[in-house]
A protein has these predicted regions:
Chain A
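Amphipathic alpha-helical dimerization/coiled-coil segments
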Residues: 2-19, 37-41, 89-123
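N-terminal cationic amphipathic segment used for targeting or macromolecule association
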Residues: 1-2, 80
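A short beta-strand-loop micro-motif that forms or neighbors metal/cofactor-
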Residues: 74, 85, 107
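N-proximal short alpha-helices
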Residues: 5-9, 25, 34, 38-41, ...
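Conserved acidic functional residues
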Residues: 29, 64, 97
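Canonical helix-turn-helix DNA-binding module
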Residues: 50-74
Length: 123, 123
C-alpha cells in the first residue's frame, strides 16, 4: 500500500546542466516569479512552502516548486516531512551573471508601475 | 473566397502594456531566443523572416514571430507582402533596464560553454 509520503529523492540539475531556456520559462510565470522574489529578499535562507501565501491550491503550488527545482532555480530538501526551499543564486549568478538580478529588478519595477505588492507572507 | 494574404493588421502591445511574464516566456524558447540574438546583432535594422535560417517549418516560424510580437519583444510591419521585424529594444530597455542585455549575455555565455553557434544566416 502506498503512503502519503512524497518520494524522498528530489531531482536537481547539476550546475553545468542548468539551461537558460528552462530558467526563463520557470521565471515567466507570475506565481513562480512571486516565489523567487520572496526568496530573494531572504538571501540564503530556507523557506517551507507554507511561508509563501500563494493564491493557488496546494497541488498547483507543488507543481510550481517542481518547475523551479527542475529548471535549477531553487533547491528543495527534506527536513523531516517538510520540503525546504532555497534559491540557487550562486549557481545562477555563476552561469548567467546579472540575469537573476535584472529579472528581479524588472519584476520590482513592474510591480511599482502597476501598484502591485508581494502577498503577505504566511506564518 | 479567402486569399493567401495574411491579415494586414498586426497587433502589438503598447509599451505600457508589455509585461515581464510574456517577455520571459517569449525568450525562453531556443528558436525564439536565436531570432532575438540575431536581431540584437543588427541593432535597429529590420529583417525579413527569411533572414533567419531556422530549423523549423514556415508555420512554426510564423508562430514564433507571433509570440515575440504579441509579447512586445519585436515589431512586425508589412513592406509589400513581406513582414519585416525589428527588436523593440527601446521599449524593453525603458521598462526593464538591463534585462534584455543580461538575457543576451547569458545566451552568449551558454552558447560558448556548449560550443553552439548561431545558425548561418539565410540569403
Amino acid at each position: 500500500m502506498s503512503t502519503a509520503t512524497s518520494p524522498r529523492v528530489l531531482n536537481h540539475p547539476a550546475r553545468e546542466d542548468i539551461r537558460l531556456g528552462p530558467v526563463l520559462h520557470a521565471l515567466s510565470d507570475p506565481v513562480r516569479l512571486r516565489i523567487v522574489r520572496a526568496m530573494a529578499r531572504g538571501a540564503g535562507e530556507e523557506f517551507s512552502c507554507s511561508y509563501f501565501a500563494l493564491p493557488v491550491t496546494k497541488s498547483t503550488c507543488t507543481h510550481h516548486f517542481r518547475v523551479l527545482r527542475e529548471s535549477g532555480v531553487l533547491r528543495q530538501t527534506y527536513q523531516g516531512t517538510a520540503k525546504m526551499n532555497s534559491l540557487r543564486r550562486a549557481d545562477l549568478d555563476a552561469l548567467f551573471p546579472g540575469l537573476l538580478d535584472s529579472v528581479l529588478a524588472a519584476a520590482d519595477a513592474q510591480a511599482d508601475r502597476l501598484g502591485e505588492e508581494l502577498p503577505a507572507q504566511g506564518g
